[in-house]
Amino acid sequence: MNVLEFQSLCNSISDEVARLLVEVLKAPEDFKASDGNCALCIMNAAGETSMRLYGNNPVRQRQTAFNAHKKALQVWLTGYATGTFEKLVYTDQVSEKQFGLSRPELIGWLGGVEAKTQSGERLILAFSGMRGEQDVGILHQAAEKLKTFSIVKH
């Protein structure tokens, strides 16, 4: 996938997430997490990155963007969804050191996932700004709706 194709896919995913957010943020507990200010980070195997911010408060957007980017980078380095990786580390099934990480660096929150494009290329998606279950849930909903990528299950 070339850079233009990657950017087109990122735009498509970002637009779908924006459509889904309208409904998801109606739940008070999800809106309250960041007052509707959310961030989506998408990466490919080469490290090319796209970020989309949602909401209208730049300070909150910056915070959620930082978290989404940290989630994406952890998945990019490890190949494991956030939450899953931490479970593996803390049960001594995997060492964080083999990925150049230390335990204080681990994000610990759900919302970062490994995915594949239709052609089998690696894609990393991370979302932040709602409850962790919804951060990852909106990515699954976008995958189901678009069919241009699928979430990798570990």
What is each residue range found by the language model?
Residues 47, 51-52, 64-66, 73, ...:
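Generic detector of bulky aromatic hydrophobic side chains
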Residues 33-101:
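Structured interaction and signal-relay segments at domain junctions
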Residues 19, 52, 60-62, 103, ...:
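Arginine residue identity/basic-tract feature
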